[in-house]
Every structure is written in C-alpha cells, then in structure tokens.
Amino acid sequence: MRILLIHSDYLKYETKNKTGIAEEIPEDKMQGDFRESLVVFTAVEAEDEDNPESVIENAVNEIIKVFNDVKAENVVIYPYAHLSSSLSSPKTAVEVLEGMESALRSEGVDVSRVPFGWYKAFKISCKGHPLSELSRSIRPQPPKVEEESEESEWFILHRGETVKPGDFEFKNRDLENLVKYELGELESSGEEPPHVRLMREKGLADYEPSADVGHLRWYPRGRLIRDLLADYVYMLVTSEGAMPVETPIMYDLEDEAIRVHAEKFGERQYRMKNRKELMLRYACCFGAFRILSDSFLTWKNLPASIYELSTYSFRLEKKGEVVGLKRLRGFTMPDLHTVCADLDQSLEEFARQVEMCMRTGQDLQVNYEVIFRATADFYEEYREWVHEVADKIGKPVLLEILPSRKHYWIAKMDFAAIDYLGRPIENPTVQIDVESGERFGITYVNSDEEEVNPIILHCSPTGSIERVICSLLEKTAIEMDEKPPMLPLWLSPTQVRVLPIAERHMEYASDLVSELIAADVRADLDDRSETLGKKIRNAAQDWVPYVVVIGDSEMEGKLTVNVRETGEKLQMGLDELIERIRAETEGMPFRRLPLPVKLSERINF
C-alpha cells in the first residue's frame, strides 16, 4: 500500500461519474466538506492481497501516529489509484479501505471515507508545516505459517491387510522407491533423467529458449505422439459416456468461488493484471464447474461426466524444479469431471474410473505404482470399500491416512510410473471432491424435487500428456539392457520403414510404401544413397518397429521383415505384415505420418 498524508485546512470533493468498479453510495456521500483533517490518499497494491489484515493494521498504526503528531481533528481516507502502478483487485481495495475505516473508528478516531471507483472533483488546502506532507509505503507481514498439523499415517495395503512400511518385505523395487519418496527418504542423485536426452535425440521436443522456462517446442514426431495420446483419451472417456466441452484458459479472480478454489492449489499460479486480476488455469476445473453450475440437472441425469483436454494448463513451478517432460510450466492435461448424486454413487463411479486408469497403464505398456490417500474419518467409515478398490490393483499399494481434510477431496487414488532414477512420475488420478458442488453453486433436483449439491469426481485417466511421454521414454531407458528401446506400435511415428538396397529396387520399394500407407500404416522410404548398413542403423536409432529390406529376392518373393522387439528376421507377404500391424494396434487411434515419406526430403530439426 502507498499512502500520501496531507494535513489540511480543508478538503472538498464532489463525485462526477461512476467507473465500472464504482461502489454504490447514498446521496449524502456524493459530496463532502472536511475541516482540519488528515487526508490519507491511499492506493491498495497487489502485494496487499497476500495479507490484507496485516496491511490494514500497519496502515492504521502509521496513520494514528501522524494524526497525533499533527493534532488533526479527523481523518479522511481518500482512494487514489495514481499512487501505484501495481494495484490490487477492486474487491480487495474496498475491503482494505473499509477495514482501515473500521479500525480507526474503533480507536476513537473521527474518520470518513471518500467513495471508491468514482471520478471526483476535489480541492484541498495543505497547511504547509514540516509534517503536513508525508508519504509512506506500507508492507504487509508475510501470512503466518500455520502450525504443523499432525502427520499422516502410512501403510502398505495388500489383500485387506495393512502393514507399516518399515515392517513390509518389499519384493517390488518400484513400490519401495515410491514409499521412500513419499516418506522423504529417497536421496536426490542430481542426475538429469534420461528422457530429457531421449526427447531431443528422437526429435520429439526440446526447450524453447525464447519462452518462459518450462515451455517446450514440439517437432512433428512429438506432436504426432501427443495427438495420438489425446485421441486415445478422447476415445476412452467418450466410450464411457463423457461429454466433451471446451472452456477458457483464463479466469477472473474476482469470482469468489474461483479465487477460493485457486487458493487451495497454493502459490504456483500464473497471474496477471489488466484492470482485473486474472489467472491462467492449472486444470479444467473452473470452466467445467461454471458449465455445470449453469446447467439444469436432475437425479435422472446422474452420474454425468464432462471432459476437456486442456491445451495448455499452466503451473508456475519453481525454476529449479522444472525438468524435461516431467515437470513443466505449460502442459496438456486431460480432465474428466463427474457429477454424482451422493457419496454412495461417487464410490461406485470412483471404482469404475480406477479401472479406467489401470487400463491406460496396460494400453501404454507402463507399470503404475499406486497410492490411496484418504482422511481418517473417511477411512474409518469406508475401510472395507477402500480395501476392495485397492484389491483391484492386484498388488500392494501405499496407503496414506490424513488426520483431517486439508483439501477439497476426502479420498483419492494416484498412479505413478517410476523413472530411471527411482522417482515417481505422477500420472492418472481419481479424487472425490466434497466442496466444489456447494462452492460453485452446482445443484441437481433429487427424487423429492429438492435442489441439492452433488459430489464431484476429478479424474485424469492418463495424467498430463507430457508425463505419459516421459514415462514411456524413462521405461525405455530402464529396459535398455533387456530389450531394444521402442514405443508401443500405435505410438511409433514410423511403424514400417522400407529400405531399397539399390536404385533398381527404388520403384518397387516406393510402391510398397504407398500400399502400406493406403492400409493406414505409417510407413516411410529411405531413398537416400547410403549403404544398407547405415540405413539399418538409422532405422534402429529412430526405433522403427518393422524394417523391410528390398532386394532382388524380395521383388520376386516374400518380404524380409526385421522385427525390432524380438530381433527376428521374418519372411512374410505384404498382406501378412499389414494384418500383423492391425492386430497389434487394434482399438488404438491412428493418424498419418506428418513428415515427407522420403527421408531425403526431410528437414533435420
């Protein structure tokens, strides 16, 4: 806050016109005439929003000190935005000005407040003595840190039995690493995770030096994989009945429900000011909840799900924590919100969505370790249900029991892949939200024709698209010594590469590629004048699952197909190859290769 204190003979003001943020005032506030006043011209600033109570207290203490020093008869608080270029929201400004007025009055000071948000004419006569013109910068104290609450209890849950982590005999290194990480026992190696090197080497993505840290540029191969993953989630959720929507990426923090929900997330938000204080979304919750609050729902509609792929979501992660595809400031998040009539219905839907999250691990060929988090009250009442859902995982899970509810959820299940360095990559999640229905005014009409607030499930079936790719690349690094690194066939940018041995084989090879493309196979042609050995090495570097070499014998008979996954060389006809690829990619989305078919025509990104 900035204040300018003028000890005046008189102050006269008259309101002229309202601005768009003017407060409503009675007739007697339209003008004012004050004598022997300490006039406090005041600008409430953005930083005051962090702790308005503190800035009110500090400002009042300073005003009373000057008031007593100059022996004024009264105080006039005059809103004056021109003292600062970094203003708070209008709502906060009015709250602070009213708070100052109330605090001064409680100290026995005769105080008046000039209306906020009006264009005004005013005249003032400054007394001109040494203390008659003073300026002050008032800083709020940092918000008091709440006393550390009781710590969570941790267990390993398997087949209905709970065991303290220290007493559990780990047979799964990934689960052991997850437990150590959650309990703060996993030491940092300081190494860069291998996916950062791989995303560059494979021409998928890279850091963009001209952007804010944590924002990536995507090359054609990487963009293709992202799009296929987005298509996959769309197919998955719509097959379960979800309805796709699209909502804005920027929200007004003057909306109290949005502001309170944002505060639950903490400080890691992109905020900006342009007359209003705005926030870039970190998930699709805000837009989804506003759609639902404007919709007419009855118990017959429930459960009802809406889905959005947020491209992009924004989180202002600390610069030192941003790394590769694992932790970004701008990312792509699939977000599913399901409105449930009551807690019983939400438990049924939760179990279904857990199965959907497990399916993504199977389809992506990624191993998930699982954490079930619940409040103590919820776990006590629904212990049997928690154990039943955990049993669906088919292996031990980490169980966190929170002593009380700190967030909007009472229970959630988090799925995490484990990277090469033994650290979790947070992927799918399902959460039971018991706050947002009421906060955002979402209601449905129940069977008794009463309007009630629903329970809402939050679910991201895969987690952020970037973290999915991160998990896939980290998996290849982990398995490098066991088998050739590769992506699932349906995500491989090039599924088949055709290598003509000599120029006389080029036309046949080109026709073969055309037939593969016509059959919805992503195929390309290495038409460069390189040795066959180099072409084979290049295909291996590109992790191409099937490599077809075309020589004289292949032109006369069956194809020689090199299978990357097994290292086999198989003889098969073109139709057999196409059918094999169709069988391996059945049910998965398909997009064409967004690159020139001939390698000689490609840009080297």
From Swiss-Prot:
One of its GO terms (molecular function) is tRNA binding. Its cofactor is Zn(2+). It catalyses: tRNA(Thr) + L-threonine + ATP = L-threonyl-tRNA(Thr) + AMP + diphosphate + H(+). It is an enzyme of class 6 (ligase). Zn(2+) binds at C285, H337, H458. Pfam families: HGTP_anticodon (PF03129), tRNA-synt_2b (PF00587), tRNA-Thr_ED (PF08915). Residues 194-488 are annotated as: Catalytic. GO terms for biological process: threonyl-tRNA aminoacylation. Keywords: Aminoacyl-tRNA synthetase, ATP-binding, Cytoplasm, Ligase, Metal-binding, Nucleotide-binding, Protein biosynthesis, RNA-binding, tRNA-binding, Zinc. Its EC number is 6.1.1.3. Binds 1 zinc ion per subunit. Residues 1-146 are annotated as: Editing domain. It is found in: Cytoplasm. One of its GO terms (cellular component) is cytoplasm. Catalyzes the attachment of threonine to tRNA(Thr) in a two-step reaction: L-threonine is first activated by ATP to form Thr-AMP and then transferred to the acceptor end of tRNA(Thr). Also edits incorrectly charged L-seryl-tRNA(Thr). Homodimer. NCBIfam families: PRK03991.1, thrS. The N-terminal domain is an archaea-specific tRNA-editing domain that hydrolyzes incorrectly charged L-seryl-tRNA(Thr). Catalysis of tRNA editing is performed by the charged tRNA itself. Belongs to the class-II aminoacyl-tRNA synthetase family. This is Threonine--tRNA ligase. It comes from Methanothermobacter thermautotrophicus (strain ATCC 29096 / DSM 1053 / JCM 10044 / NBRC 100330 / Delta H) (Methanobacterium thermoautotrophicum). The gene is thrS.
